[in-house]
Design a protein with these regions (language model features):
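Positively charged, amphipathic and often flexible ligand-engagement surfaces
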Residues: 1-366
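Calmodulin-binding IQ motif helices
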Residues: 369
Length: 369
């Protein structure tokens, strides 16, 4: 694949991606995707609460969009007044009546009634004498916005748990999914800001590797651990790299060697684009270290939204020609909003990520093919 610079023109990259894409693959991709979706829909017994919600409230109707906005935002808002305003905006302008008793889940149907009632509480109904649902408005006008806020916060917390298997290993090991499919365990959190935070993250990774090794032996499956390099040092940045490289390298080598001893796969997570070159340098140092050079349990993530994603693929191919194979986690990217804001605040000549998200999809398809 062709190499691009950090702030390369989106227009030039688009021309290249379109010229390289094989249209004959489109039907194959569509067919494979349709097959996966069909199989997932058939397995109703294994559907999570989130799946059931999305079946009724997709992104094809106003109600689904409203719920997704709430799920994304309401848990992050610190003050009650702003929460009330957001809930009022998203709930009262949606037509929940059309969704009553339409789902195959009692929980989702009950939630629909709750959302309908919430809409009436926040914005009391007009005289609905001809509407069979008039009693809802009369019944709930006395409840008040505080109760609605608390109920919706609780509902969103229930939904948010679908994205995280557990807050600690003791809760994670109760999941039956551990016996059925492979997982990579990640420590949710931001980069380390202090030395004590970095030490805490390091100790958490040590514990994670040891606990995952135990799970693997117990279930006979190959779960792994994902490691974020910026969690291992508070000054993991280009300007300080020469001063901090040895410390960071020692930390990551120690963790990877521990994983090697326990045969636990390690994936080095992707970072923001301004850390890409130093991340590649560290990964190469670790990958070529004498002890694990012949171990195929090491891998890393590639973010398709990065303009230099193809550069990373070319670099990875060259690296793997010198050692045992490595696994790659191909993602669209995790920091798009942050990357845009970072470049704007810094007055950069462009953006290090593709602005048009459809180009990210195309780039991901080309890398995958």
């Amino acid at each position: 694949m062709k190499d691009f610079t950090k702030f390369h023109s989106d227009k030039e990259i688009a021309k290249y991606l379109i010229s390289e894409f094989d249209n004959s693959k489109e039907k194959e991709i569509f067919s494979a995707t349709k097959k996966i979706i069909t199989e997932c829909r058939k397995n109703k017994s294994g559907r999570t609460l989130l799946d059931k919600f999305l079946s009724e409230y997709g992104l094809t109707n106003d109600e689904g969009v409203a719920l997704m906005c709430l799920a994304e935002s309401v848990l992050r808002i610190p003050d009650d007044n702003t929460k009330d305003e957001l809930i009022s905006e998203k709930i009262t302008n949606s037509n929940w009546v059309d969704h009553i008793n339409q789902a195959d889940s009692l929980f989702v149907n009950a939630a629909t009634w709750g959302l309908l009632i919430a809409g009436k509480v926040i914005q009391p109904p007009r005289a609905l004498f001809d509407n069979p649902l008039e009693w809802i408005g009369k019944l709930t006008q006395k409840t008040g916005e505080t109760s609605v806020r608390q109920a919706i916060m609780t509902a969103m917390q229930i939904l948010s748990k679908e994205f995280v298997m557990g807050n600690d290993f003791d809760s994670v090991i109760k999941s039956s999914n551990l016996k059925k499919s492979i997982h990579s365990f990640d420590m949710l959190g931001e980069a380390a800001r202090t030395k004590s935070q970095a030490e805490g993250f390091y100790n958490s990774y040590v514990e994670a590797i040891e606990r995952v090794a135990k799970l693997n032996r117990e279930f006979g499956i190959n779960h792994g651990v994902s490691i974020k390099l910026s969690a291992l040092h508070p000054r993991y940045e280009t300007l300080k790299y020469e001063l901090t490289k040895k410390e960071i390298l020692n930390s990551i080598l120690s963790l990877v060697n521990l994983a090697y001893q326990n045969d636990v796969e390690i994936t080095i997570d992707a970072e923001e684009q301004h850390r890409l070159s130093i991340s590649q340098d560290l990964i190469e140092e670790v990958a070529m270290s004498k002890r694990i050079k012949d171990w195929n349990g090491l891998g890393f993530a590639i973010q398709a939204y990065g303009k230099r994603a193809s550069n990373v693929v070319n670099w990875a191919n060259e690296l793997c020609s010198k050692r045992e194979k490595m696994h790659v986690r191909l993602t669209k990217g995790a920091y798009w909003d942050g990357e845009i804001k970072f470049s704007q605040a810094g007055g950069h000549e462009g953006f290090p990520v593709l602005i048009n998200k459809s180009l990210t999809d195309l780039n991901l398809s080309l890398i995958h093919i």
